């Protein structure tokens, strides 16, 4: 297993733990917000497990990159305009949220680097006689 994949696994696991720990408090804000945090925790934990048990192939890092990008985008919306059904009022920015977003950003960049590295390392096949 590679160090980069380990970084993505760590980012998934840390963010899963944080989202899971924050889910009960977000249920106080509304059922939708609580469910969103619980689902994101489960998805991140599942990704950490998937990347650990089945590390081969481009699909796990691609899904991880997509999930991290979605979490970062949803937080940007939640803090600027709010999210219509889940959290209609803009959420205040706090230190724990910023730390979580830092882990997600590291996970996103590292997952994308795994995809880029895989694309670059594909062997070029030359036709015979050239």
Stretches with model-predicted labels:
Residues 1-130:
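Membrane-interface extramembranous regions
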